[in-house]
A protein has these predicted regions:
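Structural flexibility/helix-modulation signal
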Residues: 67-107
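Generic serine detector
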Residues: 13, 54, 69-71, 90, ...
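Short, ordered beta-strand-loop transition motifs
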Residues: 41-43, 90-91, 115-120
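Surface-exposed interaction regions enriched in Ser/Thr/Asp/Glu
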Residues: 102-168
Length: 168
């Protein structure tokens, strides 16, 4: 096992080879790898947050959406003052938004709560104010997921790569 230790790189090809070799019936696989961080937030209070994924993030063209996503939380729509359940974070050309999907449509609840630097992997949230969070780890933690630009991932500065059993 090459994960769970400092200074070791995640090799996508090794993972897919392991998957292919688990059973002769598996001829090929399409595996998606996401980086994630757990962000502990202050509920119902506006705070600034910063996370650094320390890897280049996927941004193949202007207008691409889907590099960043998150677990769900409750957020107040400042335009309507309505509390929205089931909100998530998303990105649009380096701007982080609060969005909500319903009936296949994505509604933007807040069009700018921070930035995402695709080159450095740095994410900042400004005056971010979730009311409650959908408990994944605990009642004040949001999981943030990003797609990397390359499939091999290098942990930098106190990062450890772990594959959790619940994600397999």
């Amino acid at each position: 096992n090459e994960l769970g230790k400092f200074d070791l790189r995640f090799r996508y090809s090794r993972l897919t080879t392991l998957i292919d070799n688990t059973d002769p019936a598996i001829l090929n696989n399409q595996t998606t790898v996401l980086l994630f961080k757990r962000l502990v937030v202050e509920l119902a209070q506006a705070f600034n947050y910063a996370q650094n994924f320390s890897n280049q993030l996927k941004y193949p063209y202007v207008g691409y959406k889907g590099t960043l996503s998150s677990s769900k939380f409750q957020y107040i729509n400042e335009a309507t003052l309505v509390t929205e359940d089931g909100c998530t974070l998303s990105d649009a050309d380096g701007i982080i938004q609060v969005v909500k999907e319903a009936a296949g449509e994505v509604a933007v609840i807040n069009s700018n709560v921070g930035t995402l630097d695709y080159t450095t992997g740095k994410m900042t949230l400004v005056s971010f104010k979730p009311i409650t969070v959908e408990a994944v780890v605990n009642n004040n933690t949001i999981e943030i997921f990003v797609q990397t630009n390359v499939l091999d991932i290098t942990p930098i500065r106190e990062q450890v790569i772990i594959v959790e059993k619940k994600d397999i």
